[in-house]
């Protein structure tokens, strides 16, 4: 349960949702606890006390002294960067003493291994990527349910993995399949996690301050794959394809790709455009049509004997209820993951047609006078906004800006030039966005509030356009969180609707 330690003394750093879950899990299994948080009274302190947990609490700045006094295991909450000025010396001190540093995902992996010794053998699906994680995770969970499996969805999507596992154990209802949304923060402190199937949806700049650079961020994403994990890879993303196993390796893990073009290799997925219809398709080797659906180690043989590939139509992309080409890619990834753990195709395709999407993720909240109002407040990085613009593939008035987290905004220029009628700029990093978009030829306007930006965008939009809130930035410079930003956007659209004599 805790590596080679029975009931170690654990230092839990950070008492957010994940830290609270770790503390409760460790206490449940007899560990002694020291809990530290930079806040003197973190909100979850009362919840931990109410749970009847015996622990020592230390509030205030972190210091290496926290690992003194018999600490045998350090648990790091995902919001805390090991590179942070106050945390790096503590982490270094722990490692110098040979004290393991785990995050919640490693505790979860160790727990599954311990349960496995008693015969519990669930399938585990893991989803990571800069954008699209929550949609793909929710959709994969639904698909597994439609295939008749008892499913637990947890991780970055909430609830915490250890809380969900505790609930399942207490209810004597352990799931057949775990579907986990995992952030780079969670993966960074994982060591033995090895899911049955996993995907990296995409890798673009995000959280560079936390990881110290893009290479470290991408490497953290790659920790989603264990030695035998089926790798579901986005072939349209060169950074993702760096994790493709070498074709010549005899012991290479299985791999399958998805993308927005036609797939060319047996078992891969993509889009076929025919007579004005885009189809979700699977590539099938005609000579091995009766082979199992799960991808095989085939790349080396294909080089010598190219297969006779046919494209099997799965469903029209327009039959999906989630809009945009990026969501077609998410759907293909979810389907590929479910197939990779051996689930039958028919119920999965029904699930794809059923899924309605997640709030604040390219969500059309209204259509007024032929103009779509689209809430993509969850689009907190450049890659998300590029995906929203290219995915919607319609003329748009974009509302963007906020806390840019040190990102390079230059990749926005091409899609803005292609799709945008105008861009409304808000928030702290509006000047940086203006500089990046200055040569696009698209009108740019600064606004002090989101409400003003929505009104200006509405006045400019033409029938067939979208007014798209996709900020490419975090929200905390102006709002409590991205959901609060979405609420303000919706309220502004509601006001416009009322003036037009209608409601949302």
Swiss-Prot record:
Question: What catalytic activity is recorded?
Answer: UDP-N-acetyl-alpha-D-muramoyl-L-alanine + D-glutamate + ATP = UDP-N-acetyl-alpha-D-muramoyl-L-alanyl-D-glutamate + ADP + phosphate + H(+)
EC number in record: 6.3.2.9
Task: Name one process (GO BP) from the record.
Answer: cell wall organization
Q: Where in the cell is it found?
A: Cytoplasm
**MF terms per GO, please?**
ATP binding; UDP-N-acetylmuramoylalanine-D-glutamate ligase activity
Q: Which GO terms describe its cellular component?
A: cytoplasm
Please state what the protein is called.
UDP-N-acetylmuramoylalanine--D-glutamate ligase
Q: What family is this protein classified in?
A: Belongs to the MurCDEF family.
Tell me the InterPro entries matching this sequence: Mur-like_cat_sf (IPR036565), Mur_ligase_C (IPR004101), Mur_ligase_C_dom_sf (IPR036615), Mur_ligase_cen (IPR013221), MurD (IPR005762)
């Amino acid at each position: 349960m805790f590596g080679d330690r029975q009931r170690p003394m654990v230092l839990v750093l950070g008492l957010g949702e994940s830290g609270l879950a770790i503390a409760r899990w460790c206490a449940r299994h007899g560990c002694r606890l020291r809990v530290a948080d930079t806040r003197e009274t973190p909100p979850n302190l009362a919840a931990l006390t109410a749970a009847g947990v015996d622990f020592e609490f230390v509030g205030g700045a972190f210091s290496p002294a926290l690992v003194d006094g018999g600490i045998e295991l350090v648990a790091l909450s995902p919001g805390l960067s090991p590179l942070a000025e106050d945390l790096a010396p503590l982490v270094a001190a722990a490692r110098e003493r040979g004290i393991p540093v785990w995050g919640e995902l490693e505790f979860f992996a160790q727990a599954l291994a311990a349960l496995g010794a008693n015969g519990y053998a669930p399938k585990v699906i893991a989803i990571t990527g800069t954008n699209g994680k929550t949609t793909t995770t929710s959709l994969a969970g639904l698909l597994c349910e439609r295939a008749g499996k008892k499913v637990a969805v947890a991780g970055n999507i909430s609830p915490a993995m250890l809380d969900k596992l505790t609930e399942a154990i207490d209810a004597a209802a352990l799931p057949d399949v775990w579907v986990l949304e995992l952030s780079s923060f969670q993966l960074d402190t994982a060591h033995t996690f090895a899911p049955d199937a996993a995907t990296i949806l995409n890798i673009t700049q995000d959280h560079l301050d936390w990881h110290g650079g893009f290479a470290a961020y991408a490497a953290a994403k790659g920790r989603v794959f264990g030695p035998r994990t089926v790798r579901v890879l986005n072939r349209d993303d060169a950074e993702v394809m760096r994790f493709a196993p070498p074709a010549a390796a005899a012991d290479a893990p299985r791999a399958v790709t998805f993308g927005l073009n036609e797939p060319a290799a047996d078992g891969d997925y993509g889009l076929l455009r025919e007579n004005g219809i885009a189809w979700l398709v699977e590539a099938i080797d005609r000579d091995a049509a009766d082979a199992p659906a799960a991808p095989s180690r085939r790349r080396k043989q294909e080089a010598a004997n190219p297969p006779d590939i046919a494209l099997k139509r799965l469903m029209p992309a327009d039959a999906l209820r989630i809009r945009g080409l990026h969501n077609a890619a998410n759907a293909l990834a979810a389907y590929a993951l479910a197939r990779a753990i051996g689930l039958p195709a028919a119920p999965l395709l029904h699930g794809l047609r059923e899924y309605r999407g997640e709030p604040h993720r390219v969500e059309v909240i209204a259509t007024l006078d032929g103009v779509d109002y689209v809430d993509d407040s969850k689009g907190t990085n450049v890659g998300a906004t590029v995906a929203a613009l290219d995915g919607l593939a319609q003329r748009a008035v974009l509302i963007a800006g906020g806390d840019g987290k040190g990102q390079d905004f230059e990749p926005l220029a091409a899609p803005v030039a292609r799709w945008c009628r105008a861009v409304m700029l808000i928030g702290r990093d509006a000047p940086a966005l203006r500089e990046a978009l200055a040569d696009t030829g698209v009108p740019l306007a600064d606004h002090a509030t989101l409400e003003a930006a929505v009104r200006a965008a509405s006045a400019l939009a033409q029938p067939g356009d979208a007014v798209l809130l996709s900020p490419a930035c975090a929200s905390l410079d102006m709002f409590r969180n991205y959901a609060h930003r979405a609420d303000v956007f919706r309220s502004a659209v509601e006001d416009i609707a009322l003036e037009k004599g209608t409601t949302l």
